[in-house]
């Protein structure tokens, strides 16, 4: 009896270890855009060079896509809201309205709004939200708070 119990406990322990290892690799591929409020990590600049702008960590730009078809967030200076049309992993932002505060450096804000205008699909890769146009990544976000 002790041998059977020990064998069962060993198998359960082994399965737990295997399960923990496979889940720690992260999720690569498509995922749920509604899981979090997302904080901007980087965004492509609005320049011919397509340089990458790194977000200011002091006041993070945010994005939140809601299941009712709305989007809201902050560019780190101004707040915005609008609509989002989702069809699978294809999406289109539209009717974006925002406050019009005068910002010290509007480089990231201009790139952020350009990204919203250009995005046509998304991927969630290892917990990061990637907004893309075709296969080109326009912006990367990290979850700020999971729901």
Task: Tell me what each language-model feature is.
Residues 8-17:
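Bacterial N-terminal signal peptides
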Residues 3-6, 21-147:
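Lipid interaction determinants
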């Amino acid at each position: 009896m002790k041998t059977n119990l020990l064998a069962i406990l060993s198998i359960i322990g082994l399965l737990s270890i295997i399960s923990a290892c496979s889940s720690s690799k992260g999720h690569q591929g498509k995922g749920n855009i509604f899981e979090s409020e997302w904080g901007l990590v980087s965004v492509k600049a609005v320049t011919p060079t397509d340089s990458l702008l790194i977000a200011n960590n002091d006041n993070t730009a945010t994005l939140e896509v809601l299941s009712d078809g709305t989007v809201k967030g902050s560019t780190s200076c101004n707040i915005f809201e609008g609509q989002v049309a989702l069809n699978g992993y294809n999406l289109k932002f539209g009717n974006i309205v925002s406050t019009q505060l005068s910002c010290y450096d509007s480089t990231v804000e201009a790139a952020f709004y350009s990204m919203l205008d250009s995005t046509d699909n998304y991927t969630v890769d290892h917990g990061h939200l990637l907004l893309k146009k075709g296969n080109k990544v326009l912006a990367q976000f990290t979850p700020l708070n999971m729901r």
